[in-house]
């Protein structure tokens, strides 16, 4: 029992060390004059919540933001408040999504079904605020990149699979410093074994689960795709972005890859960063 406790403690320490929570970017506004904000509960759990942020004028479209944190409890949508404000200031409506993570009722399949239900609940907000849902773009950071890609892949999931038959479909998707290949992430032990913790085990043990949620196994996505990462990312290796972009392009997807010199894993959360400017440039150029 003592050895088991030591191993669990070591794993938890590794997870915390691999995804230590960044501070909010200094000197960056998180609110926009004239914006409207409303919080929606899409389930009974405290983490089953999303915040709608609307610009003062008619929005250009809706961005679904999915935060990271290696799918571990203790991280939430406030990680993306600064980039959410930047989007609203640029005329986009934002659906900033929370979900249950490992240690907070999440894991397999709850983390995935939460993200699916949360994205679909956007339809409720759209009816209340007369929002068009023909231009909905998912943007995810780190572990949220995995989930954003998976949201785009949902229309192709088999009946009965977690997240199948989406109510709201993504028209484009961006993954920023994302864990885009879960099987490779499991093999490489990313986040101290975080991939196995959210899927329930390794690809060898749960091949059928990985087939349903691993973005690298769900290509092509069939929508415009941005893959962006910092060249100095030491949390999620750059190969996760380069290799996924190459595989998506080979599968026939419209892919843009941006590897930003001198930036690391958390720069994407700062709207002043080159990584975020790459996201905005791609987003604002979408048809």
What are these regions (language model features)?
Residues 75-83, 96-133:
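Catalytic nucleophile-loop/oxyanion-hole region of alpha/beta-hydrolase
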Residues 234-240:
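Conserved alpha/beta-hydrolase "acid-adjacent" motif
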